[in-house]
């Protein structure tokens, strides 16, 4: 059996039953998902308004906010903030990968480290991610052990998983302490408060957002929600449908660190970052939002559930889609951000993805639409 078959079979056997268990034990989750879909549609229907509100809210909190049209603009802003010859730690961020942020910073002679375990592994292996929640899902335990033995030592293919995690934790702890800049994505952004929410299980994002003196968050405009109350729902729904409920950590950031312990007068900074920067990204999203069919892709919350129920993804893995976007949702997003219709051609329309999507996205319909545009030689995409 091929390495991919072994790895994905193990992952599916672990993940799929867990999601059904979570939904059975916490019956309020589907209702939260419906509310989240409604809140996301409200933003998409009034996108310009909510982008402007978010930017102003971030500024009100003492942070800096930017709106960028494409990867080049994003790279330029991040490059100016970071500078050269710095140590940068990154939390898992698909939009940062989409924009080529890590490679760009490395070209400026910065030392850049992925801190999510899966992202760290594929960085060391110089491979693309194979799943939006578990980027190193294509690696078996044995292969991970061999890779870590080669790169940092202390374990091998016969080591326990716990020991492999321990050596990476020890290696990255020094990077967190010395880091000049932390870069993350955002699972959700509250327009009314300028707050970002990040859900995780490892604790690396907490280090990334608190330890370095500068925190940069990069997120697509589709991550905006009307209120903080709406935004708080997203980590619950996303983690539940990923089979990782309850999430170990939910991080909320509203600007640079602050204190009000002297006369209840809030001043910044305190112990955490002295600077907070939010970069809101278009890169094809705004144009897709104007398309009645393609705007459905913008509702995706990146839970990765569609991957495990898709026969095509189970068969061929991360070769389906343009990294970091793989699987059924990745076939949609490859077109939104890259104008690439080829991934949609792999879809066999089993319909499983539609049945399990918490946002009720009709993924087969979207992919059929993209197929038709590809057949008619529409290569303009949505980032033209």
Task: Describe these PLM feature segments.
Residues 1-293:
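The feature marks the mature, well-folded catalytic cores of soluble enzymes
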Residues 300:
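Phosphate-binding glycine-rich loops and their immediate beta-loop-alpha structural context
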Residues 268-297, 307, 312-384:
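Ferredoxin-type iron-sulfur electron-transfer modules in oxidoreductases and energy-metabolism complexes
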């Amino acid at each position: 059996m091929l390495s991919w078959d072994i790895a994905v079979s193990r992952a599916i056997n672990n993940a799929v039953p867990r999601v059904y268990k979570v939904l059975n034990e916490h019956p309020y989750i589907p209702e939260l998902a419906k509310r989240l879909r409604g809140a996301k549609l409200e933003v998409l229907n009034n996108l310009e308004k909510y982008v402007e509100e978010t930017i102003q809210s971030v500024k009100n909190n003492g942070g800096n906010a930017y709106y960028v049209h494409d990867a080049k603009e994003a790279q330029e802003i991040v490059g100016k903030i970071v500078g050269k010859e710095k140590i940068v730690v990154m939390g898992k961020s698909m939009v940062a990968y989409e924009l080529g942020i890590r490679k760009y910073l490395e070209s400026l002679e910065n030392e850049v480290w992925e801190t999510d375990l899966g992202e760290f592994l594929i960085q060391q292996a110089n491979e693309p991610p194979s799943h939006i929640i578990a980027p190193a899902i294509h690696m078996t335990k044995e292969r991970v052990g061999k890779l870590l033995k080669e790169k940092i030592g202390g374990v091998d293919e016969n080591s326990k998983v716990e020991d492999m995690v321990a050596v990476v934790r020890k290696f990255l702890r020094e990077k967190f302490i010395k880091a000049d800049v932390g870069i993350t994505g955002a699972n959700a952004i509250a327009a009314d408060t300028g707050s970002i929410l990040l859900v995780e299980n490892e604790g690396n994002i907490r280090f990334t957002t608190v330890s370095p003196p500068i925190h940069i968050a990069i997120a697509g405009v589709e991550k905006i929600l009307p209120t903080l109350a709406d935004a708080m729902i997203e980590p619950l729904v996303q983690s539940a449908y990923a089979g990782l409920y309850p999430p170990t950590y939910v991080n909320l950031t509203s600007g640079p660190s602050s204190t009000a312990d002297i006369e209840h007068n809030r001043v910044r900074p305190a112990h955490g970052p002295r600077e907070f920067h939010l970069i809101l990204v278009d890169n094809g999203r705004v144009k897709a939002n104007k398309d009645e069919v393609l705007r459905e892709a913008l509702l995706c919350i990146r839970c990765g559930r569609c991957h495990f129920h898709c026969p095509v993804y189970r068969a061929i893995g991360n070769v389906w889609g343009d990294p970091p976007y793989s699987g059924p949702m990745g076939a949609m997003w490859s077109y939104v951000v890259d104008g690439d219709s080829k991934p949609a051609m792999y879809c066999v329309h089993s319909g499983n993805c539609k049945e399990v999507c918490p946002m009720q996205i009709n993924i087969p319909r979207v992919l059929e639409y993209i197929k038709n545009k590809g057949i008619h030689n529409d290569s303009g995409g949505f980032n033209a």
